[in-house]
Curated annotation (Swiss-Prot):
Protein's name according to its UniProt entry: Hydroxylamine reductase
Cofactor note: Binds 1 [2Fe-2S] cluster. Binds 1 hybrid [4Fe-2O-2S] cluster.
Taxonomic classification: Bacteria, Pseudomonadati, Pseudomonadota, Gammaproteobacteria, Enterobacterales
Cofactor (UniProt): [2Fe-2S] cluster; hybrid [4Fe-2O-2S] cluster
Entry similarity comment: Belongs to the HCP family.
Keywords: 2Fe-2S, Cytoplasm, Iron, Iron-sulfur, Metal-binding, Oxidoreductase
């Protein structure tokens, strides 16, 4: 086992990465190794998908499957070894079908890629784990060195984050052939074990640029189906009655669940990254979308244990449900998996609803505590002139984007302390689950404009980017000249690709934490600092002073 893709990876003087019987996330060495084998299988599939396009063959099943299966290897998504192997077998079957189509048109059709003809050696998981050793991401570390390995992993993990957003967009009916062709090109190239530093750096920026397009179609998918988010108050306390909790990012799953629970007497609560759903008109029209429950994903083993109903996980993040003894009432959907728990392959939530009706639910309603969400792209752009007016009248000094992933590390208290230390004449724009560090606090307003503005899920960084570009255009300056600072927390691969997206767009002087990615070497950090001004958090006082004086 070697996995260094998330923020909580093991860090020692000898090196970084989880490499024992189990990773810090709870992933076993077996599952981790089989994920390496799956990734190699998907790289081979992409190599042939790219070749097939030369013959005018575009297989939509391949295009939809490839990023979805890659998404299953993202942190805290799928811990189920047999399902990982199933994805690998499906990748190989799709690859062979594509290969046959190409060779029917051209008998000499071939792909020069070391994983283009990969086959699984056995049905036995132990045999497959041994085969996976040939595809361990650090297998040639001694030959290429830590810097090249770090850049490879930056590209691989960044592309994995983009694949997750591609799947979210595809579920909502969004497809762009140019994006998928670019995805296959990059994925196939990474399967050749590239070792050129400049090429890898260029690739990382290409992934960031591609992801901007992915976020654009995801935004289109969400707003076309569910309307543009508008500011909405959400109760974060319990309401008496039967209940279901839904977590993750998949708004379509939430919509289907709301439709199927309507009139049943079962209330639906959002959790984690599902919180922004309350801002969408077509979702909040369901009156039994009753509120939001819990805090950051890392607290779920305590909070889920206390929730008196079933829980549906639509995407990341799931962690061991046996710890809180709620494994009999947690349900996984789509690419999510945990051994031994119920899995919903389709969109029928009937068994979940039945379970909810059989459980006690909340015995009484708590005193409501309302927070405001729903500052989507359209709302943010509508406020652009107000922001400019406040700045011109010196009522608004600075905007801080404080957001990103949450996690368990104690140093993450930095982000709570930073938000509460922001001066009263400054605004906080937030997104993703990092907001749970401070989103239940009262920050007041500036002439009626809330000082805490919740822009949505992690992918809604797109809205923040569009706002920044709009403000810069209206003020006749560059984005980096705005009174705007980005203070980002990271945990997994979606955050990595958001960072690459921002860097590829030329955004500079981003502050990130609580630690640097484990695959970043000092040399890579120095390059990113020199080129983009990217740096790690220090202390709240020092960072605040530096950002306000920039």
């Amino acid at each position: 086992m070697f996995c260094v893709q998330c923020e909580q990876t093991i860090r020692t003087p000898a090196g970084n990465g989880c490499s024992y019987a189990q990773g810090m996330c709870g992933k076993t060495a077996e599952t981790s190794d089989l994920q390496d084998l799956l990734i190699a299988s998907l790289q081979g599939l992409s190599a042939w998908a790219l070749k097939a396009r030369e013959y005018g063959i575009i297989d939509h099943e391949v295009d939809s499957f490839a990023p979805r299966a890659f998404f299953s290897t993202l942190t805290n998504v799928n811990f189920d070894s047999p399902r990982i192997v199933g994805y690998a077998r499906q990748a190989i079957a799709l690859r062979e079908a594509l290969k046959a189509q190409c060779q029917n048109l051209d008998a000499s059709a071939a792909v020069d890629n070391p994983v283009a003809d990969l086959h699984l050696v056995s049905d036995d998981l132990g045999d497959l784990q041994r085969q996976a050793a040939d595809y361990a991401p650090n297998k040639d570390k001694a030959a290429i060195g830590e810097n090249i390995l770090g850049l490879r992993l930056l590209c691989l993990y960044g592309l994995k984050g983009a694949a997750a957003y591609m799947e979210h967009a595809h579920v909502l009916g969004q497809y762009d052939n140019a994006i998928y062709a670019q995805y296959h090109k990059i994925m196939a190239w990474l399967g050749t074990w590239p070792a050129d530093m400049n090429a890898l750096l260029e690739c990382s920026m290409e992934i960031g640029q591609m992801n901007f397009q992915v976020m654009s179609i995801l935004d289109a998918g969400e707003t076309t189906k569910y309307g543009h988010p508008t500011p909405t108050q959400v109760n974060v306390k319990a309401t008496e009655g039967k209940c279901i909790l839904i977590s993750g990012h998949d708004l379509k799953d939430l919509y289907n669940l709301l439709e199927q629970t309507e009139g049943t007497g079962v209330n639906v609560y959002t959790h984690g990254e599902m919180l922004p759903a309350h801002g969408y008109p077509e979702l909040r029209k369901f009156k039994h979308l009753i509120g939001n429950y819990g805090s950051g994903w890392q607290n779920q083993q305590v909070e889920f244990a206390r929730f008196p109903g079933p829980i549906v996980m639509t995407s990341n993040c799931i962690i061991d449900p046996t710890v809180g003894a709620y494994d009999d009432r947690i349900w996984t959907r789509s690419i999510v998996g945990w051994p031994g728990v119920n899995h919903l392959e389709g969109e029928d939530f009937a068994p979940v609803i039945t379970q909810a009706q059989q459980m006690a639910g909340f015995p009484y309603s708590e005193i409501p505590h309302l927070i405001t969400v729903g500052f989507g792209r359209q709302t943010l752009l509508g406020a652009a002139d107000t922001l400019i007016d406040l700045v011109s009248r010196e009522k608004l000094r600075h905007i801080f984007l404080v957001g990103g992933c949450d996690g368990a590390r104690g140093e993450r208290n930095y982000f709570t302390d930073f938000a509460t230390s922001v001066p009263d004449d400054c605004l906080i724009l937030t997104l993703a689950c990092g907001k749970y560090r401070f989103n239940k606090l009262d920050f007041g307003d500036i002439e009626g404009l809330p000082r805490l503005v919740d822009a949505g899920q992690c992918n809604d960084a797109y809205s923040a980017i569009i706002l920044a570009v709009t403000l810069a255009e209206k003020l006749g300056c560059g984005v980096n000249d705005l009174p705007l600072s980005l203070v980002l927390s990271w945990f997994e691969q979606k955050a990595i690709v958001i960072l690459l997206t921002l860097l590829s767009l030329g955004v500079k002087n981003i502050v990130t934490g609580p630690t640097a990615p484990g695959f970043f070497t000092p040399d890579l950090l120095a390059v990113l600092n020199e080129k983009f001004g990217l740096r790690s958090v220090t202390t709240v006082e020092q960072d605040m002073q530096q950002l306000l004086s920039a």
